[in-house]
Every structure is written in structure tokens, then in C-alpha cells.
Amino acid sequence: MNGLRRTLIVICAAAASVPAWAQVEVKAAWVRGTVAAQKTTGAYMEITSAQGARLVGAESTVAGTVEVHEMSMDKNVMRMRTVPKLELPAGKTVELKPGGYHVMLIDLKRPLKRGDSVPLRLKIENKDKTVSTVEVKADVRDAATASEHKGAH
């Protein structure tokens, strides 16, 4: 019984020390492709946090600046604003999608075309206020139609 007890203690201690990033799952990550000379695009995904957390930033090697944004309608005018912290409620999936929350890639270093993969590093603030990172590979899809993102920046 002593051996079993020790094993359980080791398992519990290991589970308690699992990094917070292991509690955040990212699915269906994609980036909208760009056309020649385009300097911005959006990244979209589904984020689920088991314990509850906040998305507080992001980085990518393909862009000079990366920000979390929210797009909304205000009196028939599309508005975009930077979001310093996006809540990730425990056990709920937050969808970053066109026309809503998204990760904005600004000052692109190269065009992004269908079939490319874009590395993203999401910065997650945990309940204890520590910040961890989640590495994501987002597939590039076809470029936006002319009506999408028009006049947003």
C-alpha cells in the first residue's frame, strides 16, 4: 500500500505542476491569404481554456506587429479596436472569426499564400497572473474578397 500511496502522490504532484499552456487548446487556426503589397491580415481560431484565462497578446515571425482586435458595427459603420485582454472563460470555446475577435498581423514581412503555414505565439495570462505561451501553426487560406476588411485600417 505504501508504494501505491507514493505513486499517487507523485501523479498528483505532476498533475499540479502541469504548465498552464497545457490547459489551453487551440483548434482550427487559419490566416487569410494576402495579395501583392498587402501589409495586414487576420488570424482566426477556436480557443478553449480548461481553467479560465486571458489572451493578452500574440507574436509572429511574419509580422512586425501582432495585436488582438475586435470588429463590431456601430451605427452601420464597421469599427475595429485593439483588445488588451480577451477573456477565455473556463470550459468555453472562444471563436476568433471574421467580423468579430481576431488576431491582426500588421506590417507583414512577406505575402501569405494558400498552403503556407504561419507560426503564432499566443500569450496567455493564467489565473495566477503568470503569462505563458502557446505555439500555434495556422494554415493560410485564400485571400479576402474586396468587401472584407474594407476601410478597417
Where are these regions (language model features)?
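Compact, glycine-rich, soluble single-domain proteins
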Residues: Q23-H153
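Repetitive helical segments and hydrophobic/amphipathic motifs
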Residues: A14-A15
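Bacterial N-terminal signal peptides that target proteins for export
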Residues: M1-I11
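Sec/Tat signal peptide C-region and signal peptidase I cleavage site
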Residues: V18-A22
